[in-house]
Structure formats: C-alpha cells, structure tokens
Amino acid sequence: MNTSAPPAVSPNITVLAPGKGPWQVAFIGITTGLLSLATVTGNLLVLISFKVNTELKTVNNYFLLSLACADLIIGTFSMNLYTTYLLMGHWALGTLACDLWLALDYVASNASVMNLLLISFDRYFSVTRPLSYRAKRTPRRAALMIGLAWLVSFVLWAPAILFWQYLVGERTVLAGQCYIQFLSQPIITFGTAMAAFYLPVTVMCTLYWRIYRETENRARELAALQGSETPGKGGGSSSSSERSQPGAEGSPETPPGRCCRCCRAPRLLQAYSWKEEEEEDEGSMESLTSSEGEEPGSEVVIKMPMVDPEAQAPAKQPPRSSPNTVKRPTRKGRERAGKGQKPRGKEQLAKRKTFSLVKEKKAARTLSAILLAFIVTWTPYNIMVLVSTFCKDCVPETLWELGYWLCYVNSTINPMCYALCNKAFRDTFRLLLLCRWDKRRWRKIPKRPGSVHRTPSRQC
C-alpha cells in the first residue's frame, strides 16, 4: 500500500533508456510482474477473508479492509503502468491516461496514509479512553471515517491533477513523460513530501509510543492487582466483594430463593459480563451478558463452595439444587458452571484486565508491523526528495526508479503483516489457498479469561 501520496516521477530524469539490454528488460519485467501478482493475490485474500470469515468482521479490520482496497488498486493499475513506463522509456498512452493514472495513484495512496492514521488514533483512544471511546466505536462510525478519508483524498488530489493545466492555461509536462504538472518545482515537491510523509510518520510514531507506554502501565497495574490476591477459604482468592454465607454448625439452611436473589446483584453479574464490542480479531467468543432479552427455559448455574461443607446435611439437600447454586437465563438452553469456586470481584477484574491487555497488545503488534513496513519502504524515496530539493543532480536516476518502486512494494508487504500478526487472517489465508474453506468445521470454544464450561441446563 502506498501510505503516502506517491511522489511524481522527477521531470529532470529520463526514464529507462531505450538502449536497455534484453536481459535487463526481461529481469525488470519478470520481477515487477511477480510483485504485482503477489500484491493483487495477497490483497484479494484479505477482501475474501473478510467476506467469508465472520470472525474478522471487527472494527479494527474495517480499517485494514480499506487499506487492502487501496493496495489492490496499486497492485492492479499503478505497478503495471509504471513498469510499462520504465520498460518503454517513455509514456506512450497519451495525456489523458497519464493524468488518470496519477490521479488514481495519488488518491489511493493518500487514502491509505489517512487510514493508517485512523488506525493509530483508534488504537490510541481505545487504550487511553476505553470506556468513553469504545461506547462510540461502532462499524457504522468506522465506515463513516473511512469514507471521509477517501473523500478528502479525492478532493485534495484528483481535481488538481486533472485540471491544473486548464487553470494555468497550458500543459507544461514534457512530451513522452508523465508527472504531475504542479509538482515540477522541487520546493513544491518538498512541501508535499513533508505534508504527505514526514508529518504523518511523526504523528503515528508519537501515538504508537503513547500506546506502548500505556500498555506497559496496564501490565504493571495488572501485576500489582494479581499480586494483591490472597488465598481464601475454599481454594479461591479472597476479595472485598465476597458475600458472607451462614454456614456454622446448627445454623439453618439458606433458602435457595434467598441465595438466588443475593447472587443476582448487579455487581456479581458485572464480574461475568463481557461486552460484545470487545470481540476482536482471533476467535469467535461468546459473550455472557445480563441483558433482559434472553430466552427463558435455560439458565446459568454457578456453583459456589460452602463455608463449612461438613455442617451441611446431605439429606436435606434438594435433588436438583443447593443453597450454593445461582441461576440465571442464557440464550441457548445450556448452563455455565464454575465448580468449586465463588466468583470473586478482584479475581474477575484481574481476568478482564488480562483479556483486555492481551487484546491491546495484539492490536498494537499489527499496527507496529504495518507502521514499520510503511517507514522502511517509503523513507528512501522521501530522503531523495529532500536531497534533490537542494541538489538537483545528486540523485542518480536508477535510485529514483528503485525508490519509487520500493514505495509500491509496501502494498505487497501489508497482507503479510496481517497474516503474521493475526492468527485468524493466517488460518483463513491458508484454507483459501488450499481450497479447503468449505470443508472447515467451526467449533465455538470459549477463549476469554474466566470462560466457564457449558453443560446441559438444569433447574434449581
């Protein structure tokens, strides 16, 4: 993906001379053709994976989907047209095709860098303002932001590229060459490089550093929280949120109804509540919520240890319930049972924080891979842009060509970054490439910390 507006081909250089040998032409053609094929294939896999695998339809991946669309445009049109330009030594497709190619290239690339900024800001606010921001973080809002990114990119570049010659009254692009007319001055090229590359990179690196610092602070807080837990009676860790149970010898048995009312307190349910919007890249994980729209006839049974098991009379136990059993409806007619352990507020808080921390680190890992690929592939060309501003003849034309093509290689690398950092993408890619997607059998296995085993429902 060109995550910066692709710089214009310098008007001061001559593209590959017609005298290039046949072996050089063959090498360039085969290499660039393979890169184009890999770019198109990789980004098509991203789009198809998003379509067929519902696990990937998360807010994070909407931004990756937009990047893949831009990369697909680059791999399909920009790479091949630029290769033709290089191999022929001149632009032979006419002025209209030249302007359309440049407009498409710049719009897609600028939209990509804006989407990368959106990902960075999304990660930053998700980490620093998890409650207020995630409540507003919906697929519809993500789609709106992506649409605005593309619209702004189109407005900034397309009219200027297509109509500049009519504004100034003449076309000054040299015959047989293809570059943006208003970028023919080095100082203007320098300004666009600063705005389109150096400024976004600075912002993204700053945001990533803040994300890293915040994630490390979360890890330290989690370690302190887990270290503060002390063993309690019944094998669980003690917590300030525990509720006392009358369990001394000779004390009357707690009525089941009273237990159910006590344990249905909102604070206890909150310990087992997971927001569906927190479901991210890996795995389709079922959320246990306290919504009112759940189906009757099924229930959650959470078994908690008695204070003194020997003091209880087995003969008085009802055959299908006990005082230490909590019920509440579920959606699918089965039960979740946590045997031998009482839900502890601090323990469940630690589990939620652990899950959130793992998710944040995974998203930050994907962002770091994309950002690193962007910097590595785009920095060489933009350094040459700065050098050429002060010394026009200091950069050989071969370096210009390699630097420009290296920017395109970013579109080839990005799908690899998604697969490297995201197991769901990786597995889907593998199954699609092996033509085995239809044979896959999904099994929903709870993966969240604190997930409890699902068994057939029973009544209290």
From Swiss-Prot:
Origin: domain of life: Eukaryota
TM ranges: 23-48, 63-84, 96-121, 143-164, 186-209, 367-390, 398-420
Positions bearing Phosphoserine: S451, S457
Topology of this chain in the membrane: Multi-pass membrane protein
Ranges of Low complexity composition bias in the record: 238-247
Residues modified as Phosphothreonine: T230, T428, T455
Cell compartment(s), UniProt: Cell membrane; Postsynaptic cell membrane
Annotated GO CC locations: dendrite; plasma membrane; postsynaptic membrane; synapse
Region (Disordered): 225-256, 274-296, 310-351
Function: The muscarinic acetylcholine receptor mediates various cellular responses, including inhibition of adenylate cyclase, breakdown of phosphoinositides and modulation of potassium channels through the action of G proteins. Primary transducing effect is Pi turnover.
CDD domains in alphabetical order: 7tmA_mAChR_M1 (cd17790)
Disulfide bonds: C98-C178
Stretches in topological domain Cytoplasmic: 49-62, 122-142, 210-366, 421-460
PANTHER family assigned to the protein according to its UniProt record, in alphabetical order: 5-HYDROXYTRYPTAMINE RECEPTOR (PTHR24247), MUSCARINIC ACETYLCHOLINE RECEPTOR M1 (PTHR24247:SF182)
Biased composition (Basic residues): 328-343
Assigned keywords, A-Z: Cell membrane, Disulfide bond, G-protein coupled receptor, Glycoprotein, Membrane, Phosphoprotein, Postsynaptic cell membrane, Receptor, Synapse, Transducer, Transmembrane, Transmembrane helix
Coiled coil: none
Any one GO MF annotation of this record: G protein-coupled acetylcholine receptor activity
Pfam family, one: 7tm_1
InterPro entries assigned: GPCR_Rhodpsn, GPCR_Rhodpsn_7TM, Musac_Ach_M1_rcpt, Musac_Ach_rcpt
Residues carrying sugar: N2, N12
Subunit structure: Interacts with GPRASP2. Interacts with TMEM147.
Highest classification ranks of the organism: Eukaryota, Metazoa, Chordata, Craniata, Vertebrata
The family this protein is said to belong to: Belongs to the G-protein coupled receptor 1 family. Muscarinic acetylcholine receptor subfamily. CHRM1 sub-subfamily.
Protein name: Muscarinic acetylcholine receptor M1
GO term, biological process aspect, one: G protein-coupled acetylcholine receptor signaling pathway
